[in-house]
Amino acid sequence: MNGVTSHASSAVALPDRFIHLLSSMIRSPSVVGAEHSFFRVLQRELEERGANVTWYEGVLVAQGDEPNSVMFSAHIDRHGLICTGPNEFQYAAFVSGARSDLLGNSVSEQLMKKIVNRFESESVFAYEPWSGAYRGRGLIDRAYICEFRNNLIFELKGLDHLVAGTPVAFRDNLKSENGALVGQLDNVITAAALVYLFELGFQGTAFFTAQEEAGKSWRYLLEWFRRFGHSTNQLIVVDTSPYPDFETAKQQTLVLRNRDANAVFNTELTRKLVDICEANHFTYQFKDKYVEQQNVLAKQRGDEPASLGSTEMGRIISASNGLVDGTTLQIPTSGYHTLSESAPVESVAGFLKVLTDLATLN
């Protein structure tokens, strides 16, 4: 299936051209804070499909002939490492977000412990951040929490020659197994879907943002809307949404939200997504309601409640003072922020169908 490793077929078939596009894009590195080379890949793919492409700091904007008809946004950064010294590497999202104990904005010990063993023995490769030129491959040898800096440090085999500032990406290939697409999907899968929309004749606007994993992408979007937007602007942010396991993830086709920890989303636009889901007989879940239900159970167990989550959409609504409004559409996944993140094929197919309905491409 166009370069995808396949172990089992699914009853739902995804378009071959979408799979081919995603397979290619997932092999192109886009580490948090070092996304320039991936923007170049995106520019080529989008212009080949007829889009008008413009670069701004932290955001690439692709537009058709009716740019105000529908607006989508997807972040394009993926987790990886940054060389910070001789054979020393740190988690790129922490570096890009300036999250270290030195600045009083430290990463929680709980989060570091969650990550420290996540990528043990994974294959990686280094690249030039602007051109994407290959700078060698290696293997994660060790990861530990440095007690002096209260930060997560990685040691690699085979990349001793790298200088500080060089990004290191995880080696990844798209796989199809047991009714799921598997790989480092967040968030290249929805970015590929927006590129694919232009292949189908999409004439609206798609934003591709950098540094979402470092909490910065919403700022780049807001800058654009302040400069080029109308008095009010409606946006649909697309992403993946994590669940504890694959069985839980595939209980719903798609994930919607009424709100996140930052803001309430646009009720009318959210209702439109509900109507499209119901018209296509897609099941859906409101993630905020799911978290609230899980928190009731957590309280009964004596555990700490989980946050409603902080999304790009919520952040921009909160900060824009009414300039930007909108909602989210998400693909449920398991294995979040790993190289084995799994998205049900049925959910990916449903996601593409809702996008095309929103863009009136039927």
Which residues fall in each region the model found?
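N-terminal hydrophobic/helix-forming segments and targeting peptides
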Residues: 1-362
